[in-house]
Amino acid sequence: KIEPYLAGLLAAIPRLLDALTDPIMGYISDNTRTRWGRRRPYIFIGSIVSGVSFIAMWQVYPENSQTFNFTYFLLTSMVFYLGLTIFSTPYVAMGYEMSSDFHERTRLMAVAQWIGQWAWVIVPWFWVIIYDPEIFATPDQGARTLSIWVGLFCLCLAIVPAIFCKTQPVDPDHMLKLTRINFGENLRKFVRGFVDTFKCKPFLKLCIATFFVFNAFNTVAGFSFFIIVYYMNAGDAAVAGTWPAWFGSISALCTTFL
């Protein structure tokens, strides 16, 4: 058990870190020069960091103190989101760079998004598995065990594009030198580019729309389980049964086919 305000901090702080590191990671990846390209090394490293830290993140025990569990989960989740940033930012960029044709690129990203949406159809049923006494003695044991299998499975899938996907060559004259000597100049160019980006009104409108859409989605996804179990069924997960899973799956299916 943990105080509600601490649970809120556990959800907010790693996300705040994620928001700050995403544009920085994009800038670093854009200007990286390696024999394997500028995307694949980060995808490889990020998949391992995020997969291992996801497993570690859920290895908490109710016997530990609230302070220990809060600190442990916060630190491991920050490492997880950092690894996710290292993986996802170059991964998305590599997807857009796989084709120079606008329509083909749109189809590629649409298929990738459609496939990824199926994860949200499956994931809600993890609640049912975790709370099933015939599978796990306690829900916390279920979370610890299931996280190992999920983390390893996702790690194996995430590392595939780093090994098998080829990236388009980039003119080195269009890239900056990421060295400590050029740190000040690179920082100024990063900030200048960040400001110039937000001067584009169509892009700014898209950012605002995305902000509200993702906030609405994450709010419903994050609280639906607790509303169904603790408000509608007085905190009894056994009585709630498979309703939380059905709610999540049907919602995800609607967005998948829309």
Task: Identify the role of each PLM range.
Residues 1-258:
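Membrane-embedded alpha-helical bundles of multi-pass transporters/translocases
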